[in-house]
Regions:
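Mature catalytic domains of secreted/periplasmic carbohydrate-active enzymes
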Residues: 2-455
Length: 455
């Protein structure tokens, strides 16, 4: 009888939900994001101690109570938020996003809504507080990742059968978001994840990726904003953090869009980021190959010329340390950006449509041509309705440029090309005016092609 009543309550909630009106953030308040181009993503939590990735609780069907006991061993003796922030700054990153809580439900902050948090762990520390302070000391914008779901709640998997439990999950989500938005000063960015998982009917494995489990009904309830009351929550967050940017993974359109481990087409009408891993896993797994400097630069440029941001993930070890090889690779990228950052920061993608060869980014009356793959002897581009005043290569010799009407052809001898990125600066008479491209979202959750992968 109780199960039947809970199923009826579930259906009533879905049928009677009326969303509140919610507005996207003012474009002027999002300019910092468009200008930043590059940020650090950090996946870190109890799962890091098991060294099998952030999904280990679910993917290996671990006992929830046994998993919770890991908190008693979570000392994080090498955790140093300042070292993390310095690594991000040295890499040329302008903001950071930390997993304040992942799908396992463990909070890295002092939550009064759940005892499953870092203050009740062996470390007895508020890691989010330390992280926020470190970001501000290094002049970095502060971002929070938060997953509304919690694998410890059976109501998440089957809310129609465990509706009261699902409502407890929902309340925990709402209350913890209010804690995060209230207790840590100004927060610049909120990166949701998990509203879309629909685990009542979906599963994932490294071999198959996402697949529908045979015999299960499609769990559309978790794709619906009615369960989380997304619009209401967004408005409450806005009242506490009026300048915050929020992504599109919480049942609404978002201030900015997420493209997970893919690039897709150029899009200039709305901010977006493409997130990827420096070592092919979000949570820490030892021995994973690290992206080369060339791969990192190619990923960054491929995203920038499409008018997006590159959010690059680092997964620290269980004790809170970043692997030296990853820190060194980030520093190498930062050194490169020290030289050529003007072609990246503060630019917009365009006015030339990108291709596998590379693309262009512009700022004011200057266009920066980034050639990351020479597929022919020359690169031909067109910048209409503007007169070329001057041009010069930034990192190569013996470049040639010839004009033919409103098009121009760039040629660089093979032995003079920069295999990381051949950059040509074009100066025009007038400021670049380009209408841009309105993007159409594709499968933003899929593991698509486009980003370079470590071998």
């Amino acid at each position: 009888m109780k199960i039947i009543e809970e199923m009826k309550s579930f259906e009533r909630a879905r049928e009677t939900y009326v969303p509140e009106k919610v507005n996207r953030q003012d474009e002027r308040k999002m300019q910092w994001f468009r200008d930043s181009k590059f940020g650090m993503f950090i996946h870190w939590g109890l799962y890091s101690m098991l060294e099998k990735g952030e999904w280990v609780l679910f993917s290996e069907s671990l006992d929830v109570r046994e998993y919770e006991k890991l908190a008693g061993d979570f000392e994080a003796g090498k955790f140093d938020a300042r070292a993390w922030a310095k690594a991000a700054k040295n890499a040329g990153m302008k903001y950071m996003v930390l997993t304040t809580r992942h799908h396992d439900g463990f909070c890295l902050f002092d939550s009064k809504c759940s005892r499953f948090n870092a203050m009740n762990s062996a470390a007895h520390r508020d890691f989010v507080k330390e992280y926020v302070e470190a970001c501000r000391e290094e002049g970095l914008k502060v971002g929070f990742y938060y997953s509304p779901l919690d694998w410890r709640f059976p109501g998440y998997f089957m809310p129609s059968l465990f509706w009261e439990n699902a409502l407890e999950l929902k309340k925990q989500c709402h209350d913890q978001l209010m804690e995060l938005m209230t207790n840590y000063g100004k927060i610049d960015l909120l990166w949701f994840d998990g509203e879309w998982l629909a685990l009542g009917g979906m599963s994932w494995s490294p071999e198959q990726g996402w697949f529908r489990r045979p015999g299960w009904e499609t769990s559309e309830y978790m794709k619906d904003n009615y369960f989380w009351e997304s619009e209401k929550v967004i408005n409450e967050i806005r009242s506490l953090q009026p300048d915050i940017m929020i992504n599109n993974r919480f049942g609404w359109e978002g201030d900015f869009h997420v493209r997970e481990r893919r690039i897709d087409d150029i899009r200039t009408d709305k901010p977006w980021d493409s997130n990827d891993c420096i070592a092919d896993s979000w949570g820490y797994i030892p021995g994973r190959p690290v992206l080369s400097l060339r791969e990192l630069i190619h990923n960054l440029i491929a995203i920038v010329v499409r008018d997006g941001n590159y959010l690059l993930n680092v997964g620290p070890t269980g004790d809170g340390d970043m692997e030296p090889e990853q820190v060194e690779r980030l520093k190498q990228l930062g050194d490169w950006l020290q030289k050529y950052g003007k072609t990246v920061y503060g630019t917009r993608g365009g006015p030339v449509l990108p291709g596998s060869w590379g693309g262009t980014a512009y700022c004011g009356n200057r266009v920066y041509v980034h050639i990351i793959e020479w597929q022919q002897d020359t690169i031909k581009i067109s910048v209409p309705d503007n007169k070329l005043v001057s041009w010069h290569p930034l990192n190569v010799c013996n470049a040639e440029l010839t004009e033919d009407g409103d098009s121009m052809e760039i040629r660089v001898p093979i032995d003079s090309r920069d295999m990381l990125d051949t950059i040509i600066e074009l100066e025009f008479e007038d400021k670049i005016c380009w209408e841009g491209v309105c993007g159409e979202e594709k499968d933003i959750y899929g593991l698509g092609d486009g980003l370079s992968k470590a071998e």
